[in-house]
Every structure is written in C-alpha cells, then in structure tokens.
Amino acid sequence: MAKVLVVYHTQTGNTEKLALAVKEGIGSCGIDVILKKASEANLEDLLSSDGYCFGTPDYFSYMAGSLKDFFDRTCYPSEGKITNRPYVCFVSHGGGGKAVGSLETMAERFKLKKITEPLLVEGKPKKEDLQKARELGKKLAKAII
C-alpha cells in the first residue's frame, strides 16, 4: 500500500492542527500516513514513503530549525533515491509566509515533484483553513494513486 510522510514542526499547535488535517485528507483516499514531528522523523521514514508533506511555522521568513535539521540529516543519504516523488507543503505564519521559499528550495534539492501551490495560513487555523489542508492532503494522495 502507498504511504505518505507528513513531517512538521509546531510550537503553538497551529502547524500541528494543519498537519492533522492534511493527514485526514490523505487517509480519506486510502493511503497510509506517517505523521511525525521533524525532530522525530528519520531517513527510513523518508525512504519508505511514496510522497511527502512538509509543514512549518514561519520563523523570520525561514522554516523551523527542526525541519531544516531533518533535511540536513536526510539529504545526502537519500540522494538519488527519492527523485520525482510528489510533495506538498504548508506554512503557518503571523503575517509573513515567506518560509515557503526555503521549503521549496529544499524540495528542489531533493529533486521532488511539486504537486500544487503551498498552503499559507495566517494565525490560528480556521475551519476553512483546515478544509484547505484536507484538500491539500487529497491532492497529494491523488498524485500517488
């Protein structure tokens, strides 16, 4: 069965709410989901997955340090092993939302295939934001099945 890795960092809980909604969307399409905080995700999680979702708060126009650490730990060991696998990403922010650039730069470095535009959510996720996150998960799932 196909599997997706959702890797995220959360400090206030906003990003985690979005990650859970993405997981729900992916799961509704019959795909297994590994949901892990960036500090807990590892190379095996990355290599064993068919697609990816990366989520982060925006910290000074950059991704969270723990997500960058995940990319640092897995980049070279996964080189050439996950090329063209699909990905989506989302950013929770307080008015900037520019961290998406650093996420997309890392996805390009891994040679992943972007499925759709990133989801940017300002402040606490509202009902409609969570629905958009579920839809983001469904789009990723449909790119795999």
Please place each PLM-identified region on the residue numbering.
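FMN-binding flavodoxin-like domain, especially the glycine-rich phosphate-binding loop
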Residues: A2-V4, N14-K17, A21-E44, S48-I145
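Short polar catalytic/cofactor-binding loops
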Residues: H9-G13
